[in-house]
Amino acid sequence: TIAVTFAIVSLATAGVLLAGCGSKEKKTEVTVFAAKSLNGVMDELCEKYNSEHPNVTFQTNYDSSGTLMTQIKEGAKCNIFFSAGVSQMDELQAGFDGGDIVEGSRRDLLNNQVCLVTWKGSDTKVTDFSNLSLAKNMALADQTVPVGQYTRKALINAGMAGSEYTEVDQLTDDVISKALGGLEINNCANVGAVASAVAEGANEVGTVYYSDTFGYEDQLDIIEQLPNSLTGDVIYPVAAVESDNTSDEELEASEDFLTYLQSEEAVKLFEKYHFTVQ
């Protein structure tokens, strides 16, 4: 009798434990593809959101917006795309094989500004963007990278690229070098690589976003913040991405995180990193 009673109690206890396991909330992983210039602030935002929503975890991928866009179009798993350029988001929103931007999820969330920088203590003769040719060399993001595109647009609008060049994609490194009196160009894969190259003294000057100077205060000097009349508006759009493999839970978590990115807490963090919220 004792053995039978023990068996019944044991089974009952096991049932309670199994029921408890079954009721535990399932974790949902959200994959975020974000421009390299968002690395610091997005790490903080994901961590804060996770502390309030422990059932949601994040997988982050930071690179140039052009590279990220290509990866998404080639089928890489992505739930949220946060671009440093409008054109990359526009291209995805036009449609791509196997996925789409979730209708109504896009927000043109942030503004930034392009800065011409040099390393702390350099003896550069460059005093503003117009006399960039006085530098010996320059770190410049590739044509596929938004900050590289904004810089090339500024060269065109300032009349520094030559009258025959009117489109950003015409300004190869060789064309820019020739237009600026033989300035040596170090082509960089993303804006983070530009900031590092200048901060380390490998290049005399470079163009980065104002937000990229955060954390580099002891290593970089800002020569000039380029006006929007030269670069155009530097807008960061963000949107949810879906494919045939996107679960309802991922979609729901992604849309809630997008709402969080517009919260007062998120706005304060963006501003801490020198972004302006639209």
Regions found by a protein language model. Give the residues of each.
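Short, low-complexity disordered leader/linker segments with a strong preference
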Residues: 1-29, 277-278
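Exported/periplasmic ABC-transporter solute-binding proteins
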Residues: 21-51, 57, 66, 85-86, ...
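Short, well-ordered coil loops that connect the C-terminus of an alpha-helix to the N-terminus
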Residues: 55-56, 78
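Ligand-binding clamshell of periplasmic/extracellular solute-binding protein-like
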Residues: 62-70, 77-93
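Short glycine-biased active-site loop of nucleotidyltransferases that positions the nucleotide triphosphate
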Residues: 72-74, 107
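Residue-level detector of structured alpha->beta connecting loops
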Residues: 76-77, 202
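Acidic, polar ligand-binding/catalytic clefts
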Residues: 87-102, 107
